[in-house]
Amino acid sequence: MLVGCFEPKGKPLDLEQLPEDFAFGLLPEDWEHLEPILANALHRVPELEQIGMKMLLNGPESFTPDDRFLLGESPELRGFFLGCGMCSVGIATGGGAGRVLAEWVLSGEPSMDLWPVDVRRFALAQNTLRTLRERAPETLALHYAVGFPGRQHQTARNLRLSPLHSRLEAAGAEFGVRMGWERPRWFNPEKRPTAPN
């Protein structure tokens, strides 16, 4: 029997600790991190306690800051195309992603609108190790969550603030983020409780 999971709070990898040639490798077993998930699995399938565990397979996944993969030409390096960050949907989307990426390489543009997965959707401020390390656990936790419209990430915020930010904040602005910019979504001067993001 196989038990798999996406933990509610992921552990970002420390890239400095990985060997340069690390590819398709596994990470050390981390039973302590798995324990809450294992407890839920045992609750759902009590027979697992008698069966026992043979091994814990712990491998890295690639999550982007918004949980959508990256396709397209790198804005930093002309002629360098990316098709990555697919986490667990790579098997399901690989064929179609490969096809449109090949079209893009050959004809200079994709045959359909790919903005939701276009690599250019991120600003440079969103592409720092600190920002990615902060956002990765939240992105993993939301991978199978209900995708409510307008949901805003709580981590890696205040990357880019306009000169008016403090005045807007004083006026009761409730902020959301687009391409790293904090911007008012609505104003709530009395600071009444609002629905969670």
List PLM regions with ranges.
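Generic secondary-structure signature for well-ordered alpha-helical cores
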Residues: 43-50, 58, 103-110, 122, ...
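Active-site lid/adjacent beta-loop-alpha segment flanking the redox-cofactor pocket in flavoenzymes
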Residues: 1-79
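Internal hydrophobic alpha-helix adjacent to the cofactor/substrate pocket in enzyme cavities
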Residues: 93-116
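Short, glycine-/Ser/Thr-/acidic-enriched flexible segments
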Residues: 8-9, 76, 87-89, 182-183, ...
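Active-site nucleophile and cofactor-binding loops and adjacent substrate-binding regions
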Residues: 56-57, 84-90
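Glycine/proline-enriched, intrinsically flexible loops and inter-domain linkers
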Residues: 112, 116-197
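Ligand-binding pocket scaffold of soluble enzyme catalytic domains
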Residues: 80, 91-93
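Hydrophobic alpha-helical scaffolding
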Residues: 20, 24-31, 87-91, 154-158
